[in-house]
A protein has these predicted regions:
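Short loop/turn segments immediately following the C-termini of beta-strands
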Residues: 5-7, 57, 121-124, 133, ...
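Short, conserved, GDST-rich strand-edge loop motifs in beta-rich repeat architectures
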Residues: 3-13, 56-76, 130-133
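Conserved beta-strand position repeated across blades of beta-propeller domains
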Residues: 44, 108-111, 168
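Surface-exposed loop and turn segments in beta-propeller and other repeat-based domains
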Residues: 28-38, 91-101, 140-159, 199-234
Length: 234
């Protein structure tokens, strides 16, 4: 099964899930008629809970032009999680993440099949959002991690956002990892479902590494830049 971002003209209305056979020929749609997501991107399923949840990037007509903030105001980027019955393909619930969950991308359930909890990285708002099952069986969400922007010199703005891209959960469900794209740091958090704590961080280059015109502002007006990463002396 693959997730689609739009139709041939780049409109988000073409978001859907396609079933492929063993030779990658299209067999048809997975979701029931009228149950397509508002935007497409990633998805993850938890069969024991009979649930699949998908995330929502944006319309190809918007992001194919490069990122423009007015497209967010025009509703061309997503802020939703779509909750489906698995394997039936019925859209059961749409979670609106609001202003704290703009552009939710990679979505991950815990690997433990008995758990109904997972996380999604929201790129534009630099938040990790936790989703979970409530007592009545519906889904809810809350912000688990917020990455603060760096105050910087010599950039187009005075603050540089984290812009979370990929996220991963360790196979033992102890740690969550994610990357901040322009910051260029990789973070490790221990997973207490409601209180994730930063336990590791590695800087791997980016806009504020040494030699760059950009610098991060820290206390007392001082500036800071990350070291240039070396691997085996290179």
């Amino acid at each position: 099964m693959i997730s689609c971002l739009g139709d041939k003209d780049g409109n988000a209305e073409g978001s859907r899930f396609l079933l492929l056979d063993s030779e990658f020929n299209i067999k048809g749609r997975w979701e029931k008629p009228g149950h397509s997501p508002m935007f497409g991107y990633d998805f993850w399923y938890q069969p024991r809970h009979k649930t699949m949840i998908s995330s929502s990037f944006g319309a190809p007509t918007a992001f194919s032009q490069g990122f423009h903030l007015q497209h967010v105001a025009e509703g061309l980027y997503g802020r939703y999680l779509h909750v489906y019955s698995w394997p039936d393909g019925d859209l059961k619930q749409t979670l609106d993440l609001g202003g704290t969950g703009l552009m939710p991308l990679e979505i991950r359930f815990l690997h433990d099949p008995s758990k109904g909890t997972g996380y999604v990285g929201c790129a534009l708002t630099s938040n990790i959002v936790r989703f979970f099952k409530t007592e009545d069986g519906s889904r809810s969400h809350q912000v688990a991690i917020s990455v603060k922007p760096l105050k910087v010199q010599n950039w187009i703005l005075t603050e540089l956002p984290g812009f979370i891209t990929d996220i991963l959960i360790s196979l033992d469900d102890r740690f969550l990892y994610f990357a901040n794209w322009p910051h260029r740091d990789i973070r490790q958090y221990n997973i207490d479902p409601r209180n994730l704590v930063l336990v590791g961080q590695v800087w791997v280059g980016g806009l504020i590494q040494k030699g760059s015109p950009l610098a991060a502002m820290i206390e007392d007006g001082k500036t800071w830049q990350s070291d240039v990463l070396e691997i085996q002396g290179h």
